[in-house]
Amino acid sequence: MSYTLGILDQSPIIEGASNEQTLQKTVALAQRAEQLGYSRFWVSEHHDTKSLAGSSPEVLVSYLLAKTKSIQIGSGGVMLQHYSPYKVAENFHVLASLEPGRVDLGIGKAPGGLPLSTKALQYGTLNQGEDFEERLTFLQQLIEQTIPKKHELYGIQATPIPQTKPALFLLGASPESAALAGKLGIAFVFARFINSDNKVLAQAASTYRSHHPNGTFALSIAALAAPSKEEAKELIGDQKITKVHLASGRSLTLQSVELAEKFGQESGEEYTVEQYEADILYGTAEDIRANLDDYHVRFQIDEFILHTPILKEFERQRSFELLSPVHLQLQQKVKVI
């Protein structure tokens, strides 16, 4: 089977660990991922939370690049609604100039926090965060140096211009996001750990391929491997996915019912909260390898980004070891984005 494996680490704060210890564990995991043959290591952006330590992926990416030698390091992702595309391009151009060919720029559409943190991130600016497609298009133009003459910022450059551009990805969980990535001709990562509906995944894959047949369609998927399927199932426990549905039509995934309720209250809209079973791949390494092979064939997945949502440090690390390209004897060849 011809696909590659990467890791998404949200820097989960295990009970009793400090923020400092948590971030050092992310560094250690990135270094181990490199040794195990993983193609990419991504970190996330979450704000005003006591459960995850990664709030500034661009800063963490720079540190991880300095602490590793060859693995691709990137954001999974930068929440572009909060920021100037120009500044994001500058940040990642600096990184790509320091570590040519190793920098991934994953862009997310979600807020990464509650309405209050969104307000804080946009405080003192004219930014309303409502023009995502325009922002993403401008960011792509800055990176590829293709700003059209009719644009009011024609002639601007996000310096320094690196010899090797950062690899640009859009992250999402809907056919609409896949269509946007396809139309822009950039790589797409479907977040199955957020939306586990395989019918939606199939539609997203088909939509993306219709716009960008030779593009990269990757899948970020929740998975846990253990020596036995019984142990893996026990480790997963009764995990839920929690969503808040706003009257405006927006739906967002939160980490708990309490946070979903808080999001709804801070939004000022009428809302409902829904919980359902988290669809996490679990079993032995061979079980999960069979699942990945199946997804690769059915949906033409080029790459899997593994997310392991448990708070037991040893068992989480062991899962990444068991699912590593070295252990599964996968030939890793990173596709040029």
What function would you assign to each model-found segment?
Residues 2-7, 40, 70-77, 102-106, ...:
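Structural preference for beta-strand elements that scaffold enzyme active sites
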Residues 2, 7-19, 82-147:
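Flexible, glycine-rich active-site loops centered on histidine and acidic residues
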Residues 61-69, 96-103, 180-183, 206-212, ...:
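Acidic (Asp/Glu)-rich catalytic clusters
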Residues 5, 37, 45, 64, ...:
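Conserved, mostly hydrophobic/aromatic
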Residues 176-194:
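A conserved active-site cap/scaffold subdomain adjacent to cofactor or substrate pockets
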